[in-house]
Amino acid sequence: MHFISEQRLDDGVLEREFTLGEIPGILWTPVSAPASAPVPLILLGHPPLGLRRMYPRLVARALDSAADGFATATIELPGSGDRPRWPVVEQARSDLRRAMEAGDPVNDEIVDALILPLAVPEWQAALDALLLLPEIGGPVGYSGGVISIGIRLAVVEPRICAAVLFAGSFVPRAMFEQARQVTIPLHVLLQWDDEGNDRQAALDLFDAFGSEEKSLHAHLGGHTGVPQFAGDAAARFFTRHLM
């Protein structure tokens, strides 16, 4: 991991951009976090729209988390932002747009090719590097982003102890079987009137999760209408499980 820039934000948070091989990312840590008392880490997921476009939302989440005593980090997803375009990813994106415009079912192969084989190993590599930093310790949580990535990470990455998932992206049927293997505590957000999300599929997915502790928080409104207090509830969830 190579840090390429550093700045202190107004809220007493240290923001550092880094690269891990070809993977760009950002790390936020409370300035008060000493190496002698490493802080828990939350991995911030986001849609595959690029870090530059998502930065305002990501930094807002990071500042809120820092106020609660957490470090946070995020990485650029494969084929997004300034990263090189992968032919298989570009083809999957094209297939996804075509299927959605035609109202056709989005098959599992499209979503799997779009994100999972590349994104999950990269998140794990980032976690390896982040946990080597003296100011960061466990436990580790995962928050938001593409729900399929969160599900896969919850299954294959034992260092993730709790997750906040946003049921606002398409989930291939194959992920339902993986959802049954998830056992960590879950806090799931659902926008009830999300026009781009199959509400019943989201409810079925929640039912499929194998976690003994799981809660579903549904709010009226569309995809971008998540109320502020929903974030407060998610913060309390992480404080309960990571502190």
Protein language model features and the residues they cover:
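N-terminal cap/lid segment of alpha/beta-hydrolase-fold proteins
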Residues: 1-40
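Serine-hydrolase catalytic machinery in alpha/beta-hydrolase-like enzymes
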Residues: 42-132
